[in-house]
């Protein structure tokens, strides 16, 4: 049984969800599935030297012969949204061709397609119609809702309407849709997707890769000159509109007279310089910005934290499920969330007593949550321990990949039947 991937990004590219793809592919190979991948030359998160190496590496065999990767030439990804959209469009056109006419693609029995970029699913749906093979759609980002949340468009706009047409076409043609939260499930049910087509599989964390590291053994403190004696509040991730970094700066401003509390922010993104300059304008000496760390140092990042922040712009929480939540918990660190009420994150944190929750944009509640844990270190420590236990019992790599394998087995059974 062969699975076809038409992927916008593939290793060695570095994205926040790279480990999920790697874990899933390892699981497929272990269970005997063969995989065929068509993907552009790598671009994201790699050096020009490494990209040059791959220009001559058109075909690659991986996972002990279980996967063949075909790479095609495509311009490097830039920051300009227009050129990025053009790159996505060209990539999808090429993948449409390969998906229909590619020699190895024509030997595949089903497709596993991710939701980045938003037109990826629609392209795969056309391949399905032509080839007559089933499609599993892995929905990591709800489009066009995500564009509304980041301020790129408004509900009811022409772009939004086009997005809804693309979204409906994709959902209608998918045989199974994997969503990463109950909020996502409810969202697409309200858009007319039958419930029996949807499977909720939370993004897992590799519990053996993201582990608690004692402060005295965490060399990141020394590398970045971060004090082990302070109460460290850590944010790691993208600096964009959706993450509501402003609420973190406001909290730092309210707590600037408490010299024992420091905010350590890791990441990248188009607005990072804006927030750095804003912190300078506010004369915030209790907030420090650091480069995004590679995945193999996630344990170090969250283990230097006494609490880890998960935040969002008000109104978009039900259209997102930050995987950093699981990384924070896997590192044995307590979560402080400033997020939309009524979401999965609120339910999981409060039900399992593994973090403190405040409504998005409620600065006073957010600051009080930080202060509560600062003043009660035993509570902070106990929540972190329970968070690690929650991951081990619910969101490990084996648990997550097994659920995906089960869906593939269901599709396989229908094909054989």
Show where each model-derived region lies.
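N-terminal subdomain of nucleotide-sugar transferases
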Residues: 1-61, 417
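Carbohydrate-associated surface elements
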Residues: 41, 183, 204
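A short helix/loop element that forms part of the nucleotide-sugar donor recognition site in Leloir-type
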Residues: 53-59, 211-226
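Membrane-proximal helix-turn-helix segments that form the acceptor-binding/catalytic region
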Residues: 100, 119-122, 126-130, 157-179
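Conserved donor-binding/catalytic core segment of Leloir-type glycosyltransferases
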Residues: 227-243, 249-252, 264
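Nucleotide-sugar-dependent
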Residues: 243, 290, 294-301, 308-329, ...
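Nucleotide-activated donor-binding/catalytic signature segment of Leloir-type glycosyltransferases, i.e.
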Residues: 259-260, 264-267, 273-299
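A short, well-ordered alpha-helix in the C-terminal region of glycosyltransferases
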Residues: 365, 372, 379-393
């Amino acid at each position: 049984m062969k699975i076809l991937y038409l992927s916008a990004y593939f290793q060695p590219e570095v994205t926040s969800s790279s480990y999920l793809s790697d874990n899933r592919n390892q699981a497929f190979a272990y269970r005997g599935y063969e995989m065929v991948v068509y993907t552009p030359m790598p671009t994201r998160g790699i050096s020009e030297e490494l990209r040059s190496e791959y220009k001559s590496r058109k075909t690659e065999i991986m996972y002990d012969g279980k996967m063949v990767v075909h790479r095609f030439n495509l311009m490097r990804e830039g920051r300009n949204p227009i050129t990025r959209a053009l790159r996505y469009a060209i990539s999808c056109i090429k993948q449409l061709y390969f998906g229909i006419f590619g020699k190895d693609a024509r030997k595949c029995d089903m497709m596993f397609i991710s939701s980045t970029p938003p037109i990826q699913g629609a392209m795969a749906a056309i391949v399905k119609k032509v080839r007559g093979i089933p499609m599993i759609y892995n929905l990591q980002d709800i489009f066009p809702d995500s564009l509304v949340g980041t301020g790129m468009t408004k509900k009811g706009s022409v772009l939004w309407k086009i997005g809804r047409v693309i979204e409906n076409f994709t959902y209608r043609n998918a045989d199974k849709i994997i969503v990463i939260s109950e909020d996502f499930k409810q969202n697409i049910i309200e858009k007319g997707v039958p419930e029996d087509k949807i499977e909720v599989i939370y993004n897992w964390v590799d519990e053996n890769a993201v582990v608690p590291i004692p402060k005295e053994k965490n060399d990141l403190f020394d590398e970045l000159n971060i004090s082990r004696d302070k109460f460290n509040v850590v944010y790691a991730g993208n600096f964009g509109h959706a993450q509501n970094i402003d609420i973190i700066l406001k909290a730092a401003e309210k707590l600037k007279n408490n010299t024992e509390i420091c905010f350590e922010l890791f990441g990248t993104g188009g607005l990072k310089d804006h927030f750095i300059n804003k912190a300078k304008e506010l004369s915030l000496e209790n907030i420090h910005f650091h480069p995004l760390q590679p995945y193999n140092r996630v344990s170090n990042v969250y283990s230097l934290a006494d609490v880890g922040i998960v935040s969002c712009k008000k109104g978009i929480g039900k259209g997102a499920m930050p995987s950093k939540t699981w990384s924070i918990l896997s590192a044995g660190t307590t979560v402080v969330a400033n997020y939309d009420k009524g979401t999965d994150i609120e339910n999981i944190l409060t039900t399992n007593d593994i973090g403190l929750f405040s409504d998005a944009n409620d600065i006073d509640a957010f600051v009080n949550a930080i202060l509560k844990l600062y003043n009660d270190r035993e509570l902070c420590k106990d929540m972190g321990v329970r968070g690690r236990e929650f991951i081990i019992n619910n969101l490990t790599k084996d648990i997550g990949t097994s659920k995906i394998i089960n869906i593939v087995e269901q599709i396989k059974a229908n094909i054989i039947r």
